[in-house]
Design a protein with these regions (language model features):
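All-alpha prenyltransferase/terpene-synthase fold signal
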Residues: 2-350
Length: 350
C-alpha cells in the first residue's frame, strides 16, 4: 500500500482564485522531505541516466556528462516519480521515463544555450561555451534520439504519444520564442502561450506519464497533466522574476540574461502596458536593442511599475490552479509532495 500522509509534510490547501499561498514570501520551502520520499527511485533514475549516456563517441560522453553533472533540480523526473507514486504504480518503467524526460530537458538546454548564445548555466560555463555550438547541437540531437530509443522499450503507444506530442510542442515554443525576440509589441497572452509550449509542456508530460503508466482513470490523468502545465508555467514566471531580482550565486545565471537576449518576458511586458510613458518607451527600446547597457534603468522602470510583484502574483495563481487540479487524487504523501512542489515553485530563490 502507498504510504499515507501523517504530517511529514505540511498540507497545502487549494485556495480561491487570487488568494495568496499561506506562507510568507521570504520563506523558501525546503525540498528535503520530497527528496527523501523518492530518494531510492531517484538514485535508480540517475544510475539509468549515466548508463544510457554511454557512447563510444568520446565527445558525446564529455558534453552529456558536463551538463548532466552540473546540478539542477531534477524536477521533471521527480514529477514522473511522484505522479506514479500518487496512483500506486508498482511497475518497472517509472525510472525509465524519469530518465527520458531528463534527457529531453537536457537536449532543450543544449539547444537553448546555442540559440541564446549563453555562456553560463547553473554557475558553470555552458556546453557551447566549453565545446562549441556545433558539438552542443549535435549532442542535443543525440539525447533526443536516445530518449526515443528508451521510450520504445516501455512498449506503450500512449507513452509514445504523450512524449512525441510534448517534444513537438516544445520545438514550436522554441521557434515562437525566437520569432518574438526583440519584439516589444507582443502582449501577455502571446508570451504565456510561448511559456506553455516551451517550458510547461514537459512538466505536463512528466506528471501525465505517471498516470499513464498506472492506467489511471481519465479524470486523474487529465488532472495530473493540468497540474504539470500550471506548475511549469508558475516555474517559468518565477524564472522571469529572478532574472531581474535573483542572486547569481544561487540561480547560477547572470542577472539580465533575458534583457541581453531581447526577450520580452512578463515583467517587461507589464511595464510597457502599465508603466509611465517614459518607462514604457525605455523598456521598448531595451527589448528592441538587446544588451545590458540600460539594465539599471530597466530595473528602475520595473520597480516603478511594481512589475515583479505582478509576475509573482500571476505565478501564485498558476500554482493555485495546479493544486486545484489534483482534486481527483486520493490523499497521500505523494499528493502532498506535489502540493509542496507548487509552493516551492513560487517561493524559491533559485
Amino acid at each position: 500500500m502507498v504510504k499515507r500522509f501523517h504530517g511529514i509534510l505540511r498540507p497545502l490547501r487549494c485556495m480561491r482564485a487570487g488568494a495568496r499561498l499561506p506562507i510568507p514570501a521570504y520563506i523558501i520551502v525546503p525540498l528535503e522531505p520530497i527528496r527523501l520520499l523518492i530518494a531510492t527511485d531517484m538514485q535508480a533514475v540517475d544510475a539509468l541516466i549515466r548508463r544510457r549516456l554511454e557512447s563510444d563517441v568520446v565527445l558525446i560522453r564529455q558534453i552529456a556528462e558536463h551538463i548532466i553533472s552540473s546540478g539542477g533540480k531534477r524536477l521533471r523526473p521527480a514529477l514522473v516519480l511522484l505522479a506514479a507514486g500518487a496512483i500506486e504504480y508498482r511497475g518497472p518503467h517509472h525510472h525509465e521515463l524519469g530518465a527520458v524526460v531528463e534527457f529531453i530537458h537536457t537536449a532543450t538546454l543544449l539547444h537553448d544555450d546555442v540559440v541564446d548564445e549563453s555562456a553560463m548555466r547553473r554557475g558553470r560555463r555552458t556546453a557551447n561555451a566549453e565545446f562549441g555550438n556545433a558539438a552542443s547541437v549535435l549532442v542535443g540531437d543525440f539525447l533526443y534520439s536516445r530518449a526515443f530509443q528508451m521510450m520504445v522499450g516501455v512498449n506503450s503507444m500512449r507513452v509514445m504519444q504523450v512524449l512525441a506530442d510534448a517534444t513537438n510542442t516544445i520545438a514550436e515554443g522554441e521557434v515562437l520564442q525566437l520569432l518574438n525576440a526583440h519584439n516589444a509589441s507582443i502582449g501577455e497572452e502571446v508570451y504565456l502561450d510561448v511559456v506553455r509550449r516551451k517550458t510547461a509542456k514537459l512538466f505536463e508530460a512528466a506528471a501525465q506519464l505517471g498516470a499513464v503508466l498506472g492506467g489511471a482513470e481519465s479524470e486523474v490523468e487529465q488532472g495530473l497533466a493540468t497540474y504539470g502545465r500550471h506548475l511549469g508555467t508558475a516555474f517559468q514566471l518565477i524564472d522571469d522574476v529572478l532574472d531581474y531580482s535573483g542572486d547569481a550565486t544561487q540561480t547560477g545565471k547572470n542577472l539580465g540574461d533575458d534583457l541581453n537576449e531581447g526577450k520580452p518576458t512578463l515583467p517587461l511586458i507589464r511595464v510597457i502596458q502599465h508603466g509611465s510613458q517614459a518607462d514604457a518607451a525605455l523598456v521598448r527600446r531595451a527589448i528592441e536593442e538587446g544588451g545590458r547597457d540600460g539594465f539599471e534603468s530597466v530595473l528602475a522602470a520595473i520597480r516603478n511599475t511594481d512589475a515583479l510583484a505582478y509576475a509573482r502574483a500571476r505565478a501564485r495563481e498558476e500554482a493555485r490552479r495546479a493544486c486545484a487540479a489534483l482534486g481527483a487524487l486520493d490523499n497521500s504523501i505523494y499528493k502532498q509532495s506535489l502540493l509542496e512542489l507548487a509552493r516551492f515553485a513560487v517561493e524559491r530563490a533559485f
